[in-house]
A protein has these predicted regions:
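N-terminal membrane-anchoring/stem segments of glycan-assembly enzymes
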Residues: 1-51
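Internal catalytic domains of large membrane-associated glycosyltransferases
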Residues: 30, 34-249
Length: 249
């Protein structure tokens, strides 16, 4: 390897691949170091306290051939935590189904009725299944925005397997309410419940330094952070006005 007689094509390819991966790893290390420096030099900002905001917030759970028991279980846990806080009636939960299997859809409906019976007084829970799942998840959310979005100030878009604490949901609501220029606030998802060895390794690394990496990425982005597709609170009106994109042909 790498003999004095010259560098072969294979050796050139190895050097190129190592160089590319080194750049990627170095970028991640620099990003984490930036977050550490900020942590050490800037005082931690306390969570906002006081009277809660009056915004109406919709929790949206798009589902497509998911386990109804798991979805309703996570939804129930979030609703129960929200019910223990103030102004819980400002929140409503929507299960937005694109499921095609009639038997699975029937199971979803049964799980929904059970969920609605257990939710706290004043909290609305809805289930909607589209007959035609045009444009997949994007179309699912678009359908909700066009049909129900005008009744809510913000939407918290979740994945089918998302589980957020009531405190996290309320803090996202507080932060969005306090910053009138913010259109979207992205949370930092944390992996839980991994079963495989690789999944456990990812979960461990996510717990150890994932939050630092996320803070570093936020430093690069400043006020123009990206949307990861779930676990973020979004102001509905600006989203309706500016975020509809033409189909890519």
């Amino acid at each position: 390897w790498f003999a004095a007689g010259g560098v072969t094509l294979l050796e050139r390819a190895i050097v190129a691949l190592v160089g590319l991966t080194f750049v990627w790893i170095s970028f991640s290390v620099i990003t984490v170091l930036m977050a550490l420096v900020q942590r050490m030099t800037r005082p931690c900002r306390l969570a906002r306290t006081g009277r809660g905001p009056s915004e109406r917030v919709a929790l949206l759970i798009p589902v497509y051939h998911e386990d109804p028991a798991s979805v309703s279980g996570n939804a129930n846990a979030m609703l129960q935590e929200l019910a223990r806080g103030a102004q819980h009636d400002n929140y409503a939960l929507f299960i937005l189904s694109d499921t095609r299997d009639p038997e699975l859809a029937e199971m979803e409906e049964r799980a929904f009725f059970s969920l609605r019976q257990n939710c706290a007084l004043g909290m609305d829970v809805f289930y909607r299944r589209r007959l035609v799942n045009a444009d997949k998840k994007v179309g699912n959310l678009t359908d909700w925005i066009e049909g129900w979005g005008g009744a809510y100030d913000a939407m918290l878009v979740l994945d089918a397997d998302s589980l957020m604490s009531g405190g996290a949901i309320r803090r996202l609501t507080h932060e969005l309410s306090a910053d009138l220029e913010a259109g979207l606030i992205q949370s930092v998802p944390v992996l839980i419940g991994a079963q495989t060895l690789f999944g456990r390794m990812q979960q461990f690394s996510n717990a150890v330094y994932g939050w630092l990496l996320s803070e570093g990425v936020a430093l690069w982005a400043q006020g123009e952070g990206n949307y990861w597709g779930h676990n973020a609170i979004i102001r509905v009106a600006p989203f309706m006005e500016h975020c509809a994109l033409a189909p890519i042909k």
